[in-house]
Regions:
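A feature for loop-to-transmembrane-helix boundaries and adjacent hydrophobic helices
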Residues: 1-273
């Protein structure tokens, strides 16, 4: 058990310069930058594998478009699903990314769109690109959840103050659900995908495994995470929007994983990624 120290979300300020500023640099943005940088390093190393259809010269563009898709999709998805009333009251709120508020599922759709377009550009199948990208997205997910923790947002439900996992927030003992998600969606997801993709795998299999592992981790953490205030529980007094969006990911992931390995078994010299 420990007491949450209420971090200052602003890491440092620059300026004012030439009458503008000061420019506030927030931990939330820094964490995303660190996540993308680590993903870039890992992806460049992986691209050097002899079987990889994605070459090192593609990695810079891929990371740029992943970041663009994740940020735009994540922010738009969050505001449409969780903060629509806020957008109606203040349309400019959608651009205030530094204040927090990113939806994984929106960001996921943004990345899918960006990688589909980039795959067409380099003339590679969609799942070849996504299989390459999947393990390295875990760095961004981990960094984003640490950013949530620093911002003091997305806390878990109350728990016993005597519990070893309890974090005291404003006098209440709570689950640090952001750290649970950082572990499951970051550390566990990366290790599973990295170990699995260290040798050639059937096209689509790594992407499918991403859907399964992320979906299961998110679904489980939702049981101890406070539901979004705007939505509350959707059904049965415990079903959350996060679970509703994660369940299809798990189902689709299982189907794609089976299909990928079945095709590899049936087709000699089937494509690998």
């Amino acid at each position: 058990m420990f007491t949450y120290p209420h971090f200052n979300p602003v890491a440092f300020s620059i300026g004012p310069l030439f009458g503008f500023g000061p420019l506030e640099v927030r931990w939330y943005g820094i964490m995303y930058l660190v996540g993308f940088a680590l993903g870039w390093l890992g992806a460049r190393s992986h691209a050097k594998q002899p079987w990889s259809k994605i070459k090192p010269e593609h990695v810079d563009d891929i990371v740029f478009y992943v970041a663009l898709g994740a940020i735009i999709g994540g922010r738009v998805g969050y505001m449409l699903i969780y903060g629509f009333s806020e957008v109606i009251a203040d349309p400019l709120a959608i651009f205030k990314v530094w204040q927090g508020g990113m939806s994984f599922h929106g960001g996921f759709l943004g990345v899918l769109t960006a990688m589909w377009l980039y795959g067409r550009h380099i003339k590679q199948p969609f799942f070849v690109v996504m299989d390459f990208v999947a393990p390295w997205t875990a760095f961004g997910l981990f960094a984003g959840r640490i950013g949530n923790f620093i911002n003091g947002e997305l806390w878990g439900k109350t728990t016993s103050p005597d519990a070893p996992w309890a974090v005291i927030v404003d006098g209440q003992a709570r689950h640090a659900s952001q750290l649970y998600e950082a572990f499951l969606e970051g550390v566990v997801l990366f290790l599973v995908l990295w170990l699995y993709s260290r040798k050639p795998r059937p096209v689509m299999a790594t992407s499918a495994l991403f859907l399964i592992v992320y979906g299961v981790g998110r679904f489980l953490v939702e049981f101890v995470r406070v539901p979004d205030q705007q939505l509350g529980y959707l059904a049965l007094g415990w079903v959350t929007m996060g679970q509703v969006l994660s369940l299809p990911m798990i189902i689709v992931g299982v189907i794609l994983f089976v299909l990928a390995h079945r095709r590899a078994a049936e087709v000699p010299n089937a494509a690998v990624s």
